[in-house]
Amino acid sequence: MHIFITGIAGFIGANAAEQLLKAGHRVTGIDNLNDYYDPQLKQARLAPLNKNPNFRFHHAAIEDPDVLKNLFEANSFDAVIHLAAQAGVRYSIENPRSYLNSNLIGTFELLEAARAHPPKHMLLASTSSAYGANEAMPYQETQRADHQMSFYAATKKSTEAMAHSYAHLYQLPITMFRFFTVYGPWGRPDMALFKFTDAILNDRPIDVYNHGNMRRDFTYVDDLVQALILLIETPPSDTPVTTEDSLSPVAPHRVLNIGNNAPVALEEFIAAIETATGRSATRNLMDMQAGDVPATWADTSLLQALTGYQPKTDIQTGVRKFVDWYNSYYS
């Protein structure tokens, strides 16, 4: 298959491309390589991909309609994995305009390009933040998700609605996946695992929000990528697979959680980092950050029914692999 990935130089995009290339697929990717975090880290993720003859990289922004139009005209993509986005709940409070451009306009331009040259399946990234103030645990795809707590979450929930309209109007098979706190080697510097590891190894205190009373459904990146690969060949059909299927009644459109189905307390997460680094953390206990939620928990039963997906990586193993990568990369 020929697969198009947006946000190819990102943490998830580069990992997905690596696994797809290993499986013998062709991959074309696009990324604007912006400076939200260190562009050299993005270039380092791309370096091994660029050595593969089945890989093509385009340095451009998805908000540019001509770029996507030309790419879709010149290629026949079997599947699209849309990962390009301005990420980060906290950053969106101070820089909302960048989320408007990348998340909303960029997704619109991608949907327009796909409308003219339809792939067999589009997989578009949403987020667990789309569940907003919902306190019913675990999060299930058929639950109401109406009260987003940050502009980032609002833009991602909006892309779900945009995608549904295109699926209905143009019969584009679209799966929206809400992923839950993805972590692992090559992770983003703005994420807790990277920030905590960097601080602990450099004898700085870590900021612990809500005084540590937080739980997250941490999802190891290899598990997430395996779910995406399984989903590529599972586009929405006319028939629900469970009684709680989020399949739209009027469009080939489905929303799916991708998580670990096992929330981890923040203190357990920090303890895993302390064990992996061999050092103790100095905690700076703080109030809850605006736009954040105290807990997330993915119900993955629909994903399991569709693909047989089973996450394989526990938090201790995943954190250790990240710390090993961090020490190697920054040595």
Predicted regions and their residues:
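N-terminal Rossmann-like NAD(P)+-binding domain of SDR-like oxidoreductases, especially those catalyzing
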Residues: 1-182, 228-232, 309, 313, ...
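Generic recognition of short, well-ordered alpha-helical segments
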Residues: 15, 40-44, 70, 91-94, ...
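C-terminal substrate-binding subdomain of Rossmann-fold SDR/epimerase-dehydratase oxidoreductases
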Residues: 19, 200-331
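Short alpha-helical
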Residues: 63, 87, 187, 264-265, ...
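A glycine/serine/threonine-rich, flexible loop-to-helix segment
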Residues: 137-138, 189-197
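Hydrophobic alpha-helix immediately C-terminal to the catalytic Tyr-X-X-X-Lys motif of short-chain
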Residues: 158, 162, 166, 196, ...
